[in-house]
Amino acid sequence: SKGVMLPYRSLWSNTQFAFEVLTLQPGNKVISILPMAHMYGLAFEFIYEFCAGCHVYFLTRMPSPKIIFQAFSEVKPHIVISVPLIIEKIIKKNVLPKLETLKMKLLLKVPLINDKIKEAVREHMVQAFGGNFYEVIIGGAAFNQDVERLLRSLDFPYTVGYGMTECGPIICYEDWLRYKPGSCGKAAPRMEIKIDSPDPQNIVGEILTRGENVMLGYYKNPEATAQAIDAEGWLHTGDLGVMDEEGNVTIKGRSKNMLLGPSGQNIYPEEIEEKISNLPYVCENIVIQQSDHKLAALIYPDFEEAYKQGLTDADIERIMEENRVAVNAELPAYSQITRIKIYPEEFEK
């Protein structure tokens, strides 16, 4: 692990960014869901709110959907800041099951009824988050595209940002009214972004950034610092992406995570993981390359939901194998999943 040295200019710039775009008022309420040990949570669920004179409510337990719903209902926060996993869990457990019944699928095909249902679902979701917020800001990891499509179809007020500890943390953001679906926004104030690619709009390259938010370097580690920040001050994020002509950045994966297929094809495990996460009873998953260069998926199933439905461990194994077959039907031959391994507990974070 490396210690990140953040100067006061980075803390100031991140806080100033929040004052410029989040516009909370003295006395507004925010629920702190994220750990204070992470810059994302520290910067945007404490430092900014403290400076703005807001009330910060700290969760004292692990943020399960039930606990979060209770907190939203009681506090009614003015803005919601979270990581994708929490939002996805809430939607998968409380929204998708209601939309995926046969009756609901049939009703959604009728135009006028479709609009009424979506309006009701949107209102239900807004109330689930307290009914008093301007937008939900999602960041810290890739956001599931199926969940995002649902939110967009409902005109739900959400946006996806991008950052890292080395930038204290913000790199990209866009207000939900101007946000481009699938992206993570545009360069934040006082930050620049470029893609290390001959064609940044179409050919994936490493995302580079520089500006007031960027760290001084890694604590007592000049070698790692020199590898991360080049002579022109560009921080090499290690993330791969593209950027359109309007400056919207879309992340494709991590350069360190990228795998090579049998004939040299680029495989981005995050894209496969996203497909797997949409399958039945999948809570978390990681795609790895085995010693024989074939791909395997490590899956932590949603045991709570499975057992509630009366399923046995053997049933779960069968369903996961069916999931493997289903995801392979959507993948090219060089990125097929050949094996599933079930994990008994959540992955370490």
Predicted regions and their residues:
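Gly/Ser/Thr-rich phosphate-binding loop
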Residues: 78-81, 91-179, 283-284
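Conserved adenylation A10 loop of the ANL superfamily
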Residues: 1-3
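Conserved AMP-binding/adenylation subdomain of ANL enzymes
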Residues: 8, 12-29, 36-124
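Residue-level signal for inorganic ion chemistry
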Residues: 80-83, 193, 247, 276, ...
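Conserved ATP-binding/catalytic segment of the ANL
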Residues: 187, 194, 201-261, 289
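Adenylate-forming
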Residues: 214, 248-277, 304-315, 333-337
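C-terminal boundary motif of the adenylate-forming
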Residues: 196, 240, 245, 279-303
